[in-house]
Amino acid sequence: MSGSYTPAPGGPFSALTPSMWPQDILAKYCQKDPGTEVELQYDEFGFRIDSEDGVETRKWLCGDGAPQREDPQQRLRWQAHLEFTHNHTVGDLTWDKITPTLARSDRLRSLVLGGIPHSMRPQLWMRLSGALQKKRTSDISYREIVKNSSNDDTTAAKQIEKDLLRTMPTNACFNTLTSVGVPKLRRVLRGLAWLYPDIGYCQGTGMVVSCLLLFLEEEDALWMMCALIEDLLPPSYFSSTLLGVQTDQRVLRQLIVQYLPRLDKLLQEHDIELSLITLHWFLTAFASVVDIRILLRIWDLLFYEGSMVLFQVTLGMLKIKEDELVSSENSASIFNTLSDLPSQLEDGAAVLGEAVRLAGSLSQENLDTHRHKHLAYILAEQAQLNSNNSHSLNTNLNKVVRRQNMRRKSTLSSLLWGEDEVEALKAKNIKQTELVAALREAINRTAEHFHCLDPRNCSTDLTPDYSMESHQRDHENFLVVSRNRRRRAKALLDFERHDDDELGFRKNDIITIISQKDEHCWVGELNGLRGWFPAKFVEILDERSKEYSLAGDDTVTEAVNDLVRGSLCPALKAIFQHGLKKPSILGGPCHPWLFIEEAASKEVERDFNSVYSRLVLCKTYRLDEDGKVLTPEELLYRAVQSVNMSHDTAHVQMDVKFRSLICVGLNEQVLHLWLEVLCSSMSAVEKWYHPWSFLRSPGWVQIKCELRVLSKFAFSLSQDCELPTKKEEKEQRPLKEGVQDMLVKHHLFSWDIDG
C-alpha cells in the first residue's frame, strides 16, 4: 500500500493480519530520529507491554515459542501434507487449489497437535473449522449481512456499542473508537446479532471475535463465528439462557470426578462452585483468559476437533496446578489459585500435552451422553421454577437457525418484467414466518423482564389464546371498570418526616392517597403509617385496570424503554411495513404512520360530533379517562392526535411517532384491540396494503393474539421520551410554587389524618 508502514519482522504488530496494522503507531516506530521514543510499547500482537513485565515478555519473544518465528521443518511438514493430499497436477500448489475442507486423518491431527505455522493459520483455520465452506455456499453475502444489520436499531446494537472498548482495552487495535479494529468488531457483532435473531448479542462473542480479527479479515471472522455457533459448539451456547454452556459446566464437574479425584474431593470439602470461574473460560473459548500465544495453540485444536477440546484443556490446566491446589490452606486460597490459573500458564505445548495425556480418552460419544443427561436435569429444574417458559426452553434446544435472505430482483427489473410468482410467494411466506418469530421473541423478552423484576408477574401465562371466545372476552374485559377504587401515587423525590402528622417517603415509593381535599397538601398512607405530604412531591399513577409495576416504568427502569422502543417497536413496524404499497416513482411518502392516521380517522368519523364532545369532556373535566366513556376506536384517535400535536412541533420522523403510539397503547393495555381496529378499517387497509400483506390477510388475528399477552403487564411509558428537551423544560425540583402555601396551611390548620 502506498504510504503505509510495515512492522519489522518479530517487532510490534508483526503477527497481525496486514489490515489490522495501526498505521499511526507504526509511523512513530519508523521515525528516523533516534532521540524520539514511542510512549507505549506493544508486542507482536498489539498488546501493550507494561513496564514491570516488559523484560519477561521480550525474553519470551526471543525464544522459540514466538508464533511468527516458524520452525522451517514444521512448515515443510505442513506443505508436504497439503501437496500430497491436494496437488494432483504438475505445478505450484496455491491456496485456491486446496479444497474448502480438509480430509480428516491421523496425520492431520498429529500436525494440528504440533502447531500450525502462524502465517498459515488464516487459511487453515477456515478449512479446519468448515468456515470456508459456509462462506462459499451461503445464500447471503457478507456485504448484504452488513447492510441489513447496519439499520438494525435494537437493544443488541446498543449493547454492542457499549462493549466495543471494553472487549480488548489493552490492545492498540481496539482501545479507542478510532482504532483500526473497532469498526470491524462493530460490523461483525451486529452482523451476528442480525444473522442469529434467537441469539442476539452475547458478550462472550465479542471476546472471540476481537481475537479472530487480529489474524483474519472481518468477513472470514464472521464465517468462523458461524462455524463455532452452528457446528463446533452445542446449541444455546451464546443464547440468553446460556443453556449450552451451563450444561457443559455440569459435565466438566462430572469429568473432574473421573479424571481428577483429588481435586474433586478438595472442591467438595471446601464447597467451591467451580463454574463461577470456568463458565467464562468456556463462553469465550479461552479468549482473553490465557495468553494469546497459548490461545493460538488451543484454537488450532479447537477448530479441528470442536468443543471437546474445551474440556481437555481445562482438565489439563487443572492437572498442572493440582498439587498447588491440594496444598492450599483455605477456601479463599483455592479460589484465588483457580482464578489466577490461566494467567500463570506460559507453555502452550505443555498445556496441550497434559490435556491429551490426561483426557485423550474422552470421546465425543461420551461427551454427548453426559450433555444429554445434565441438560435434562437443568430443564427439569427450570420447568419447576417456571412452567410457563417451557416453550421457550424447548425452542432454545433446537439447532441454531441462521436468518435466511431471499435475493430480490432489482427495482428496474421488477418494474419491467415483474417477479417470479412462485419465488415471490415463497419469499413472502418465509418473510411472514420470520416477522411473527421476531415479534414473539420481542414479546417474550419483555415478559421475561417483568418476571425478573416484579415477582407478582412470575405466574403470568405467556401462552397466546387463539380461541374464538378470546376475541369476545377482549371487549367484555375492556368494558369492565376496575373495582379497585384506591388511588396511588409515586414519589418524585425524598421527603423526610419531621413531625408525627407527616408522611415520610423515599423517591419512587408508592403511596396510597387517602385525601386530596387540599390542592397543595394531600393525606396518604405508606407501610401502615398515615400523614400529610406536599402534593407536588408525587405523581398520580395511572392504574385504571392494572396495578402499578416498577418494571414497566421507564423513569425507574430504563431497560423497559430499550425493550419496547428498541425491540418490540421495530418488530411491529416490520409487520406494518410488510405488504405496504409503494408509491409511484414520482409519488409521495410511504410509512405505516400515514395508514394509522387515516384508519383511525375513518373509524371515528361516523359519529364525529359525539366523539369530539366526549374528548373535550375528558380533557376539560377529566371525566372517565379510564375507558368508561372512550371506546378503543376513540382512544386510538385521541392517541394519534396527541402524538401528532406533541411531535409535530419537534419535527421528528414518523418512526418516532409510531414508537410513541405503541407506548401509549401499552400504557392503555389496548394494543391488541388497536390492531383489530386498524385491520377492520377495510377501505384504508385496501388502499395501503397488498392482498398478501399481514393486515389484509387473516394473519393479523394471530398477531392480535400475540399482542394480547402484553396487556397482562402494567406499563408506564413516557410518550415523549424521544423528543428533544427544551431548555425551559429542564428538570426542576418541585419545591417552588405553592410550597409556601402548603407550609402556612400546615402550621395554621389541624389535619384530619384519618380522612
UniProtKB/Swiss-Prot annotation:
Keyword Coiled coil: yes
InterPro entries, alphabetized: Rab-GAP-TBC_dom, Rab-GAP_TBC_sf, Rab_GAP_TBC_domain, Run_dom, Run_dom_sf, SGSM3_SH3, SH3-like_dom_sf, SH3_domain
Segments forming a coiled coil: 419-445
Pfam family, one: RabGAP-TBC
Keyword Transferase in annotation: no
RUN domain location: 559-722
Ranges for domain Rab-GAP TBC: 115-306
Stored SUPFAM superfamilies: RUN domain-like, SH3-domain, Ypt/Rab-GAP domain of gyp1p
Family (UniProt): Belongs to the small G protein signaling modulator family.
Stated name of the protein: Small G protein signaling modulator 3
Source organism (scientific name): Danio rerio
Lineage: Eukaryota, Metazoa, Chordata, Craniata, Vertebrata
